[in-house]
Regions:
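Conserved glycine-rich Rossmann-like NAD(P)H-binding loop of the short-chain dehydrogenase/reductase
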Residues: 24-41
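Conserved NAD(P)H cofactor-binding loop of Rossmann-fold oxidoreductase domains
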Residues: 86-91
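Substrate-binding pocket helix/loop in short-chain dehydrogenase/reductase
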Residues: 94-96, 102-107
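Active-site helix of classical SDR
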Residues: 118, 154
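Residue(s) in the substrate-gating loop at a strand-loop-helix junction
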Residues: 138
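SDR active-site lid
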Residues: 166-231, 242
Length: 257
């Protein structure tokens, strides 16, 4: 059964992907930690569409989680022809004062889980000469971000990794794309306990997913969501990297000193 696997699917961008793709007739396998939210979303999709919505409650911060998830798809006889690596989180603050264990957990989820899941599901897609992988990066991946040092670095990895795989796989029928949202109305700021930016700069998860699906139809390797975000990422190419870093640091420093 052809199925889209979405990680971080219980809310935000992941849930928006689930709703948009279900409306297009795609079966979905939703993965997140919160079983209650996954059940509610599967029930919602079942009421509103004719697709089959399934879930796996799993913490991808655990090193063996990707293997467990892959084995579960085989047990259910699901053919994953679209993988959306959306699960991730960020931290903010002076790196020297942050919990080192939490920073390493972020690397596990934002990087290792993405690489592990991609490597497990990609071979079957190539064998079938069709498939799609969307890795959710961030506009933070285009430059260093003081006081978000680890988070920005993980998203830079996802961006570079995805661009490389786009070229490696484009002649094998598999399309790999990096989605780079800017500030999005999810639970990120509540969890990080920081001030939200002005609402005019914030997109909804639905807006981000609509942009992603348009970019996917055009076979783009990188999609930046939002005109302002795209303009900023392009402008940074013409400014010294050290200046971009200092400007970002100046904007965030007062919150943490």
């Amino acid at each position: 059964m052809n199925t889209t696997l979405i990680t971080g699917a219980s809310s935000g961008i992941g849930a928006a992907f689930a709703r948009k793709l279900a409306a297009r007739g795609r079966n979905v396998l939703l993965v997140a930690r919160s079983e209650d939210k996954l059940i509610a979303l599967c029930n919602e999709l079942g009421r509103l569409t004719s697709i089959r919505a399934q879930y796996v409650a799993l913490d991808l911060e655990q090193p063996d989680a990707a293997a467990q998830l892959f084995d579960e798809t085989k047990k259910r006889e699901l053919e994953i022809d679209m993988l959306i690596n959306n699960a991730g989180f960020g931290s903010m603050g002076d790196f020297a004062k942050l919990d080192p264990n939490r920073e390493l957990e972020m690397i596990q989820l934002n990087i290792r889980a993405v690489v592990d899941l991609t490597h497990r599901f990609l071979p079957a897609m190539r064998a079938q000469k069709r498939g799609t992988i969307i890795n959710v990066a961030s506009t933070a991946g285009f430059q260093a971000v003081p006081y978000m040092a680890t988070y920005a670095a993980t998203k830079a990895f996802v961006l570079s990794f995805s661009e490389a795989l786009w070229d490696e796989n484009r002649l094998h029928g598999v399309h790999v794309m990096a989605l780079c949202p800017g500030v999005t109305e999810t639970g990120f700021f509540d969890a990080s306990k920081i001030e939200r930016p002005p609402m005019r700069t914030v997109q909804t998860p639905e807006e981000v997913v609509d942009t992603a699906l348009r970019g996917l139809a055009r076979k783009k390797s990188v999609v930046v969501s939002g005109w302002t975000n795209w303009l900023m990422t392009e402008a940074e190419r013409f400014v010294p990297r050290s200046l971009v870093t200092r400007v970002a640091g100046k904007a965030l420093r007062p919150r943490f000193e």
